[in-house]
Amino acid sequence: MSNNKQTAAPAATSNEKAENGAEKEAIEKFVEVVRNTPELQGEMFFDGCIIAMTKDAFKGKYRVFYGNGLHTSIMFGAGTAALDLMTPGSFLPPFPQRLIKSREGSAPTMEATDPMMSRVIILMNGECLDVNSELINRPKTMGDDAISNLTDDLNNITPKEGEATVKEWDSLPGGELRYLSKANKPDETYMKDLIEKYFEKAICHNGKKVEDYVFFLVANPIAMVSLARKGFMSNVNMHNYESFENNIVIPADDDELYFGDHTFKVAVNNERLNTSSVANCNAYVRPFFHGCNGFYQGRNKRIYPESHDLYRRDYIKDYNTDYKSLCYSRKTENVMPVCDFISSTAATLVLQKFPLNYVIEHKFTTEDDDYKTKMAMSVKLDLIKEIAIKNRYRPNVFDDNFHVSQDRIYATKYQGHLERNTISPNALHTYKTGGKLGIAGELMEGEKMSQWVHTDIASKFTSMENFNKNGGDEAALCDDEEKELGFGKMYVTSRLSSVFDFKSIFNANRMTTQHELSSQLGDTDTKKEQKEKRSKQGGSKLFNYKIKSAFNPVFNSLKSPAQKILFNMCGDRTLFKSVMEDALFLLRDEIFLEDKLVMTHPAFAESENPNHCQYCKCSFNNGMAGVENKDFCFCYLILRTMCALSAREPTQFNITNLWDKTAFPSELPPTTTETFDYNFNMNVRTIERKNKCSAYGNAVLTDSERENGFADPNLKEENGSKKKLQSYMKEVKLEALIKAVLTAEPTLLHPDQRINMDKITEGDEFYHKLEANRFAKSMGYKQDFTMGSIGPDETPNGSYQLSSIKSIRDVLLKDSKSSVDYELNKFIVVPGKMTHTIKGTKKSDDGDSKTDGSGDMEDDFTSLAKMTNRKRKAGGKDGPSKKKKKDGADKSLEKLARAMLLDLLEISIPNSDASLSLEEQNQEIRKFWREKQIHPDYIFLFPNAEEKRKLTPETTKQLCQKFMKVVGICRDMIRPEPTSSENIRLKLVTTYMAGVRDYIKRLAEFLAKKLNYSSVEEMRGYAMSSIRMKNESVKKTQSSWMDPQSTSDPVQKMMERKITSAYATHRIESANTKVLPYTDSKLIPVCSEIPIPARMILCSVGETESDGCKRLGYNIEGYKRNEKDIKMAGEKQQPHSYLTPLEMKIKMDTFQKEAENIEKEKYVDGNKPETAAREEIFKQVREKEINCGVYIPWEIMAKDLCENAGYKDSDVLDPAVLAHILKRADVKFEKLGNGGFASALNCKTIAKLLAGYLDTMEDVNVTRPSLITNIFSDMDTICSMVNKIGMNMKSFFGSYDYATFDMATFNLKDTLLKMISQEPELGSVLHLLITMATIYGVNTSTNGKLFYKSYERDSQAAVVGIGGILNIFLGMDACKSSNAAREIKQAQRKINPMITTHMDYNMKRGGGIDRWSTLDTAKCQGMSRYLGCYSFSTYPGQQGSNDIYTKLKLSGGFFYNSIPAHICAQSKSHNTNKVTMCLKNSGVLYSSFKRGGRNVDIAELLNRGDLDDINNTILSTNGLAQKIAAYFLSSIGIEPKTNGFPDMGNMSKSMFVRKIVKIHFSEFAEEDGEIMVERKVLKHILGFVYPDDSVVEKPDMFMVYDPSAMDVDEDEDEDMDDESDDESDGEEMSGE
């Protein structure tokens, strides 16, 4: 894609050719769209303008969304905003053109000019844009005044005594910030004069006032520089440089700004604005011109001479007439005045757009420090104007007044050329269009536009629209403003991570090179000498230049973290405010600590007032209980946010620790170049679909013993094709093999326990929604409720999710006593199917034991009672009647009870889409009982009841059978220990492990077939001896784009511009290129040209209207009519060559580093003399034949085998040890599932080994393979669902049978050990898998906290399975080299995956963001972002080539000691894994956000039943707890009091809790549920009800019984509970 010639470039691969072809096609389509859309181009005759637009235009539907998504920030009615939001529309085209005067008698030419800057300056009445202040509750200490005071303190910084002189200080980056104005908005006098002179007559009509309009300033880069310079140089002649040391006055260009002669009126057609409801929506524009804009100075009477062929055209004649209206004159009265606010804001915007991260050594001297600072700022701005904007170098000016190295000047020219000439094709989607794809939306169709990154605003809008469409009840419950706010801040976590991480390149205010540092430290070696020195030392022939964040005394003089952040934002107070609001949004309701502790400021812990922040001049954290107006300072907010991002508890220890690491990131300047290894943390954007390389790079497998490798040995030579096929199959690329496995075997889940989210059936979707909507909050569920896969290269990997509900129903729908399937009618009428199919799992040859349900009712009931009281025999064969039915439809008690249980299952888990609520379903049940004249307690009372005569014998029998069996099964679900094979948890775990076993077997069979082995057994033999992986490391390369135009986030823009600056600096350093007078676009690498011809689309001016303004527009129709004539007349339309976004490569090493305790080994000619003993051991193992025929267990960590294999004192397993183990243990994958894999004799041994391993699962200091962690998490999730259902059933039947039956705590270990005793093979499979995962898996203990669990589990299963079955490791083939001696580490080699998750996944809470499929509507699914540490590396081209290439390289310390490291929840030891985390733009993202300070509907809040939501709302809303307390008291008939406590009489706290739970939280009406309600909600309420709220009593044990629904009095309810308990005991006795 580079334009420079490469004489020895390698031949392009087929993939590269395809990509280049796709890119060329995309460029052609982009140019075609621009050519066919005249509104995208137009004459931009001015350099800036001041616009007045009615406030009504900003009251559109998506006002909140655009205000946040485009990062509008206002203080005191003034600030900055995105041009995309503020532009009137087509008046400011994205591809502006300007007429250029030609020689006398010739027509002017049309050429491209700079567009307006992407940020505008809001001057007045911008309060209507400040949506965050309306929605995000801020304490006074975080208000606009506090931010203003913080900025004033930054302006007052001065160099310390002895640290630097004023001259040196001003030469440093940021030294000029102390001269920024303290003004928060323009002077009232300035705005009053401006409005009276240019706008008042136009806007004040038809009842309109000045207060009804927003005033803002728009300017192109050169005009913005002039605005900034004029404020700093107010006392200096703007036309000249002042006399310096040599007393020479050097003339400069006219840098003045002049207002035009007219105020124009333009139509507002920006689709983001509320133009539809505003009649005749217009904006009033006063243009201004830069002094160098000579064409519009009014010197020409006609721009087209009469002799020109086009003069006779009406189109041109009209423009000749309008020309004078467009001009300006250099009169004194037309000079544009500039106030301090405009100048300072313009300076910050310019410095953000063109960062100067290096020292500028001034040569002028003066005694006036204030004047010197002004000149220093002026020089920096002039440097930007001349080099970055105009791309010209004036040695006679620059060299005489200040010194900048030639390398830096070239880098600035390089960066400026990219900034001004790069065009983002996808930026069209957000310019003067609505949130939808808009005017160039067709560009996103298909795959053609996947070459470049899409805009974040389009991604956010698409996500929000999809949430509205597919979000269901959650979307309906969210009000529009909350929804828009959530999506507008969709990337808040990555943004804050960049700002608060002081190792981020965003915070690199000064960068230096290794060569510069060497010069500063007195190293006189030249670059050439340094290269030669490194070459002699055996290093790279090319000197590896690096970029480092250098010491900056200005930055380090700041102690407050808030000031440091403000400093790195170039003093932009409005941008700082928006970041602080992002932090408040991220924390939401968790700003204050739950225990209300007052924390001490880490910097002032030893002071007299440790809670007072001397930086922010307020309390550090005033979060005490009882303090009504809680507040905190900026330091606390920043540290509290860092705790949230790093998943740390906000304790005093953690906050102090973070302070020590971040408040003073670099106290001392560097003193040596030997440790010049600083890596920047960057947040770069990539496109996943464009990156063809997988995480496994170019690693290949080979079989050294087979002549043709993996080719089919039976392949016959036909037409010379044998050689080609043999060559292709000689080696197999690991990437292709893993992809094939992920496609053929996408998941290890059992078919009865999984749901395919890509091809979800109606029934599976029903189960999925039940589980997601009912249990996600109440269980703290960690499952991924995501519709659609996110696997790489469109494999189905990641699309299969575990379904607990489906798993449990599968167990209940199987009948171990029947050998045939049958259907059973449901007992209770609820939504869904009316019958259930019961699958008979009994072996057909055991048919004698089948039971008939037609025996004597008395005997059946007696048998059932025995089972209920745990005295029955397993299998339920006690009944005396064992008759058979010919049709096989067994009507035994087991089947009836299962049907009843299925009914109860749906009762306890109501469908969110069902027509009946939980209460309504319960009412339906009671209605059924009444219709049948059955008393609900009749089952227990009928021996003595008169109502027995009302029932038929059949009805009585069925009711008894169903109810008693349900009681038994419920008890089995919640009993403490797995006592029998009928235990539901045991069945679920057994089914899960059976799925794992079958997966490994299918995987082995697939690999054997794929690699052309005749059998799994044959493949196993070669795996033990000859299958190896070639390549010492596995690399992955990703493509990334630096495309600031495609993001509206100022932080992301600044970051990408600094990356580009560092890239340019590194390139010139490494290439040692001389500075060119004019930057040649061919020197810009990895950019393609986009030729866009200039179109003759001229302005048109209408007649003066009643408001005194002329209508300004574009003569598009005239241009279309005369386009042919313009071409025939020879009009020059030379295309301007724009550049595609700068593409960079990111190289990632996905091999895990070696452990430090493994010594280096010498390999000479492929031999290993010092490990001959170890090789002899393995040779003996391979030759030894084991004939036991079954699986032999071993110690999981295999320490004894490690020592025997030559690994002394090592806990590390590697593939060589696994080869030893698999051979010794006689692992035969082909025997899995056939009954011959494992022996029951080894059960105790395996159980003991696994028990020891399971005991380590609770140890947080022990790292475990991610695959094993996820498998255990899955099993625990399913069994926890059993507990939850058991609790619901206990609540349903509690009054009758469960008053004394306690809920058990599930123990996965006990269940697994029980499974091993019954299924020895499954225990062996788990044992084997743990060892394989220890070797080939990733030791990242995320526990589903951040990563996409389904994807991580199944992708790891594929890698672990392939590695273990083929026993792949770096064999001798990888160690052979042309070098006589080669040093290599032969230790464990783990293939680490690309961990993919979604952007802004709730890293703080470990889940909770719902996502829906966007594959049908979103066009940017391939978008990704990377958070990681990068360093620049350089390498030469092929031999004979002079080309030098540069890449970004992912460093070994991925996420090391940075905030992203804590986000990833990896310890220091884990960082060596170099796990690459790909943060995908979420298809749908919404985090519930409750605005502070608004009225809360208490009834609506309580009806949601979300305890976490209620808790957070109480914490975030002042006075709400007391209001809810009054609400609760009124609901139980007690009058609340405004002051003091209510009269509670004899009602204890436990009784109060019971009543409140019964009335308002009936779904939590069981013991555990009550405790949960009390802990999360009532703890805030009891303090307003009872005086002593220090200790809250634990509520008494009780069961919920609804007397009103059963038509029973409350007094009878108490008696009934007692009778039920007594009669239940009686039944147990009778059962015996």
Curated annotation (Swiss-Prot):
Residues 1607-1632 have a biased composition (Acidic residues). Residues 842-853, 875-890 have a biased composition (Basic and acidic residues). Glycans are attached at N149, N274, N654, N719, N797, N1012, N1031, N1261, N1339, N1511, N1546. It comes from the Viruses. Its main location: host cell. Residues 1-15 have a biased composition (Polar residues). It is found in: Host membrane. It is a single-pass membrane protein. This is Uncharacterized protein ORF22. It comes from Ostreid herpesvirus 1 (isolate France).
